[in-house]
Amino acid sequence: MGKTSKRFQELLKKVEQDKIYNLSEAIDTVKTLASAKFNETVEIALKLNVDPRHADQMVRGSVVLPAGTGKVVRVAVIAKDAKADEAKAAGADIVGADDLVEDIQKGIMNFDVLIATPNLMGLVGKVGRILGPKGLMPNPKTGTVTMDVAQAVNNAKSGQVNFRVDKQGNIHAGLGKVNFTKEQLNENISTFIKAINKHKPATAKGRYVKNASLSLTMSPSVTLDTQEVMDLK
């Protein structure tokens, strides 16, 4: 633990604690904070001025990052007949129906994203209690309940990121890897923020974004200019 703390203390010296960074400066800074033995993820944290206890203030959706996430995503699809064929042709890793649900019931879930056609959501409901806590339950708002399974598979493979505000009004997301170019990270982060702004509830009052920061998996965070964040449309 001491070694980790010393490493973290060294990284803290590279961050001006009281400074508000614009997005360009923030990306430059976090790229200098890479210190782990793996390719760290660039993460964003947003504190929104919403109350998710009210249905009309829930912020939830998905967005495809232009430069991808840098991760290999395994996609499973619950579909039958022609839709199953479409999913396979689109590159889905696992395609099934009753057999796939049985595997899930046994705890066999070798996938990162689950897509289902609307007519089979009754079947998916049998394993809702297993999928829900893992964040794998298909949902129309994230484009994972759809008849266009080919597009959904393509989105997932291309770098789709799902977001959902938590009970405290926070949203966290990984938006690429530290070895991405500055341009790739800027494009990904800007695209994500625009999606968050697009989903601003009509009933939200005051400043929509209260706090925003950027960090790596194992680094301190840098504070983003919330006005610049809110101005990204």
Curated annotation (Swiss-Prot):
Disulfide bonds: none
Biological-process GO terms, alphabetical: regulation of translation; translation
Residue intervals passing through the bilayer: none
GO CC aspect terms: cytosolic large ribosomal subunit
InterPro entries xref list: Ribosom_uL1_bac-type (IPR005878), Ribosomal_uL1 (IPR002143), Ribosomal_uL1-like (IPR023674), Ribosomal_uL1/biogenesis (IPR028364), Ribosomal_uL1_3-a/b-sand (IPR016095), Ribosomal_uL1_CS (IPR023673)
Gene Ontology MF terms in the entry: rRNA binding; structural constituent of ribosome; tRNA binding
Key word Transmembrane present: no
Domain of life: Bacteria
NCBIfam families: rplA_bact
Similarity comment text for this entry: Belongs to the universal ribosomal protein uL1 family.
PANTHER family assigned to the protein according to its UniProt record, in alphabetical order: 54S RIBOSOMAL PROTEIN L1, MITOCHONDRIAL, LARGE RIBOSOMAL SUBUNIT PROTEIN UL1M
Biological role: Binds directly to 23S rRNA. The L1 stalk is quite mobile in the ribosome, and is involved in E site tRNA release. Protein L1 is also a translational repressor protein, it controls the translation of the L11 operon by binding to its mRNA.
Self-association and partners: Part of the 50S ribosomal subunit.
Protein name: Large ribosomal subunit protein uL1
Originating organism: Campylobacter concisus (strain 13826)
Lineage: Bacteria, Pseudomonadati, Campylobacterota, Epsilonproteobacteria, Campylobacterales
